[in-house]
UniProtKB/Swiss-Prot annotation:
Gene: rpoZ
Organism lineage: Bacteria, Pseudomonadati, Pseudomonadota, Gammaproteobacteria, Pseudomonadales
Entry EC number(s): 2.7.7.6
Subunit organization: The RNAP catalytic core consists of 2 alpha, 1 beta, 1 beta' and 1 omega subunit. When a sigma factor is associated with the core the holoenzyme is formed, which can initiate transcription.
Family: Belongs to the RNA polymerase subunit omega family.
Catalyzed reactions per annotation: RNA(n) + a ribonucleoside 5'-triphosphate = RNA(n+1) + diphosphate
Record function comment: Promotes RNA polymerase assembly. Latches the N- and C-terminal regions of the beta' subunit thereby facilitating its interaction with the beta and alpha subunits.
Organism: Ectopseudomonas mendocina (strain ymp) (Pseudomonas mendocina)
Name of the molecule in the record: DNA-directed RNA polymerase subunit omega
GO cellular component: a single term: DNA-directed RNA polymerase complex
Keywords: DNA-directed RNA polymerase, Nucleotidyltransferase, Transcription, Transferase
One Gene Ontology biological process: DNA-templated transcription
Gene3D superfamilies (alphabetical): 3.90.940.10
GO molecular function: DNA binding; DNA-directed RNA polymerase activity
Amino acid sequence: MARVTVEDCLDNVDNRFELVMLATKRSRQLATGGKEPKVAWENDKPTVVALREIAAGLVDYEVVAQEDIVEEEPLFAAFEEEANEPL
């Protein structure tokens, strides 16, 4: 298990607040099983894996947001189909 420091992550993120928000969102994606890790899992918790991905420069807001958009598209498509049905 590799140790991850805040300083390692701040090389790829602007500030600590952004780091917390990004790590939280990514760790939730990993914990729910919806997304595959971009680094070896190594028996770590989802939060540690998310921080390791950020420190390695593999995950940023664009990657996390893009994965969310792909996940939400079918939900909105089904909602729009129901809204267009005649009453």
